[in-house]
From Swiss-Prot:
Gene that this polypeptide is encoded by: rpoA
Organism: Dichelobacter nodosus (strain VCS1703A)
EC number: 2.7.7.6
Protein name: DNA-directed RNA polymerase subunit alpha
Domain notes: The N-terminal domain is essential for RNAP assembly and basal transcription, whereas the C-terminal domain is involved in interaction with transcriptional regulators and with upstream promoter elements.
Cleavable signal peptide: none
Any one Gene Ontology BP term: DNA-templated transcription
SUPFAM superfamilies listed in its UniProt record: C-terminal domain of RNA polymerase alpha subunit (SSF47789), Insert subdomain of RNA polymerase alpha subunit (SSF56553), RBP11-like subunits of RNA polymerase (SSF55257)
One protein family per Pfam: RNA_pol_L
Annotated keywords: DNA-directed RNA polymerase, Nucleotidyltransferase, Transcription, Transferase
Region (Alpha C-terminal domain (alpha-CTD)): 245-320
Amino acid sequence: MALTELLTPRIVQIKEIGSNTSRVTLEPLERGFGYTLGTALRRVLLSSIEGAAITECQIDGVSHEYSAIEGVKEDVIDVLLNLKNIALLMPDLERAEIRLSVTEKGAITAGDFELPAGVEIVNPDCVIAHLTRDIPFSLTAVVEKGRGYRVAPQADDNSESTRSNVLRLDASFSPVRRIAYRVEQARVEQRTDLDKLIIEIESNGTIDPEQAIRDAATILHNQIKVFVDLESTEEETEEEEEIYIDPVLLRPVDDLELTVRSANCLKAENINNIGDLVRRTEVELLKTPNLGKKSLNEIKEVLAAHNLELGMDIENWPQN
């Protein structure tokens, strides 16, 4: 092989390391290519793989999300948060409606839903709520297909969704729950300055982790192949540095330009960086003094504009 010829990597190992979790090892890569490919694949896997999620629901006897449900242990907000944990598979449909109706005391799970043809729930044991006594409980939910994260639209007081008691949910469509990568040193013959890319990916069970990587690579290929036909030669870009934490997450919360009320509430909780904020869950933020649902919606909308969301798992983030 000529000294100027780039090495062609190959997949040397695919190992299942847990439920819906796999580790893929790729080598050899030219120095710096491990971080280049790892960063690109990670971003695409988190933001661009198609999936399904519940986007709205109606609960009999409930008019708004701050209600308490008679005979139900959880309040409405907790029920909505539990609905987000349901992993749905809907390959041939864009939108579907699912229903459940129970009357007996005990746990209500995703397996209680009546599903139309073409819709599957892969975690039927997911708990939605608990009935404290024998009473009727009915819930209707809308499932939609999408990509990335979508903040629930805010309905006007006179809108149709408000009159019909529709509860809208923020939707995380990505079937990828966690993606992490690391780069180690590789060797080929006398060369020891090469990269080995190791990717660990966990899905919600609706997609095989290996298939998710293939889909991400296909998306990248389709986006980049347009440059192959360029006639002019572009300037070479510098190799990416070995970044372990996205610089955006290190920026102060003030850069989000939140309202004074929201910003002061976050500072009072020692939430100083964007990374500190996205690691918090909705439930945790709602426990913050003086931070209500309006401020929470503002925070979620601003984060969504930066392709971020609450409850993110950030690798290597320093613990407080």
